[in-house]
Regions:
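Structured alpha-helical
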Residues: 1-102
Length: 102
């Protein structure tokens, strides 16, 4: 598991994600992003199973970026599936203007 040592915010955002699940089916859903940093977040509320290394699109406030899935967990709770994501190098963080202090 990767460990990041950068500032994170305790705030959360509703974001739209899309990509292909582990069966190859396209999906598009709204989930909650928390533990937000300049280069990643923890997504909660996913209803689709993903794989480590999958690349998904994350949209927030009219901006869209690609992230790599670096950690997954089926929470077996109202959080459904959780995924830690990390921003791809060539991308710009979609929530950067929302959390300037991050």
């Amino acid at each position: 598991m990767e460990h990041r040592h950068e500032a994170r915010t305790n705030g959360s955002l509703v974001v739209t994600i899309n990509g292909r699940d582990k069966t190859g089916q396209f999906f598009n859903e709204q989930v909650l992003a928390s533990r937000i940093s300049k280069s990643g977040a923890l997504l909660s509320g996913l209803s689709r199973h993903l794989r480590l290394g999958d690349v998904i699109s994350v949209a927030y406030s009219g901006k869209k970026s690609r992230f790599k899935v670096v950690w997954l967990r089926d929470s077996e709770s109202h959080h459904l599936i959780q995924a830690a994501i990390h921003l791809l190098k060539a991308e710009t963080c979609p929530w950067m203007n929302t959390f300037r202090a991050v």
